[in-house]
From Swiss-Prot:
S-adenosyl-L-methionine binds at L73, G104, L123, S124, A125, M126, T127, L128. It catalyses: pseudouridine(1915) in 23S rRNA + S-adenosyl-L-methionine = N(3)-methylpseudouridine(1915) in 23S rRNA + S-adenosyl-L-homocysteine + H(+). Specifically methylates the pseudouridine at position 1915 (m3Psi1915) in 23S rRNA. This is Ribosomal RNA large subunit methyltransferase H. It comes from Nitrosomonas europaea (strain ATCC 19718 / CIP 103999 / KCTC 2705 / NBRC 14298). It is found in: Cytoplasm. HAMAP family: 23SrRNA_methyltr_H (MF_00658). The gene is rlmH. Belongs to the RNA methyltransferase RlmH family. Pfam families: SPOUT_MTase (PF02590). GO terms for molecular function: rRNA (pseudouridine-N3-)-methyltransferase activity. GO terms for cellular component: cytoplasm. InterPro entries: Alpha/beta_knot_MTases, RlmH-like, tRNA_m1G_MTases_N. The keyword Cell membrane does not apply. Keywords: Cytoplasm, Methyltransferase, rRNA processing, S-adenosyl-L-methionine, Transferase.
Amino acid sequence: MKFHILAVGNKMPDWVRKGYTEYCQRMPKEAELLLVEIKPEKRVGSKNTRQLLQAESERIRTVLPPGCHIVVLDETGKQATTMKLAEMMDRWMGSGQDVAFIIGGADGLHQDIKQMAHEKLALSAMTLPHGLARVLLAEQLYRAFSINRNHPYHRA
């Protein structure tokens, strides 16, 4: 099974790339972590926020794996403990369906993307930088997998 992270933004600092790569490499093939960076819409001319989000929404749809379980990351989503995320991961893996996590850009996500999601998840009630959200999500997915496999990484 694959966990796809579809993230709007393609010019991340080196620390983001290194942090994400660290946890991506730790994930076993049975729970492969794949990142797809989506080019953000340029803020030019008379484009308003709605138009920017619509353009990004279309880009997201073109790379969204067919038949996957869609989880939108949004500060208004459901907050879950790490143990709850481990339960969710166990359920997702049991379904055999790939999971796509969608992280919006500077202006968030278009309402259409939010409405097509099967779940909305919040990493925090606070707004996070998009690069940090990638690293945090990758780490939490690795931690959840470790919990489900009784790996000593999670010692809480």
